[in-house]
Amino acid sequence: MQPGRFYVLRGENGAGKSTLLRMIAGLNEPTEGSILIYGIPNKQALNRMGYMAHAPLLYDELSGMENLRFFAQLYGISSDEPLAKAMERVGLDPKLERRVGQYSQGMRQRLSLARAIFHEPKLLLLDEPFSNVDPDSALQIAKLLADMRSSGTTILLVTHQIGLLANLADEYLMLSHGQLVDRGAMPGAAS
């Protein structure tokens, strides 16, 4: 993968897309070989990556901002400013005090994305970021991803909703049974 490019990871259910993202993010170990991010082992590059799981990894008993504060500690971030900015970028009010357990699925999905981007990662790994979000939120997320790509962030995204990304992503990678079987330019991608 090249820096600053937007890749869509495709394949049928069970092809290994989510597993590959989890391996890159350091959550699963590869059965053989190693994963390098910017020339260093992936587990040493965790501070350069943002990861959004298909099922939001959040604490239901905390507010949205409290969730982000918890994860910000892992990155040595003590200021609320980048956390509030990330929440606003995904269309959530950082002052909302409601517990995440009371959020809709779409709000949880957007908060999970805010958790993945508040530290401005160089590599963003997203597993189905458009699931459970309404059409307006999906467009807002697509615009956010376009802005991040323009700022040099490399994006690797798993989705079955290709239409939304046809003019945004640069390239698709097709997996089958855990193997890369095809790759190519996305329809509408600029060369």
Region locations from a protein language model:
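Helix-to-loop junction immediately C-terminal to a conserved catalytic motif
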Residues: A25
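The feature captures the beta-strand-to-loop junction immediately N-terminal to the Walker
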Residues: R10-E12
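H-loop/switch region of ABC-family ATPase nucleotide-binding domains
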Residues: T159-H160
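Conserved ABC transporter NBD signature motif
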Residues: G33-A45
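Conserved ABC ATPase "signature" region
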Residues: R69, D80-K95
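Catalytic Walker B motif of ABC-type/P-loop ATPase nucleotide-binding domains
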Residues: L124-D127
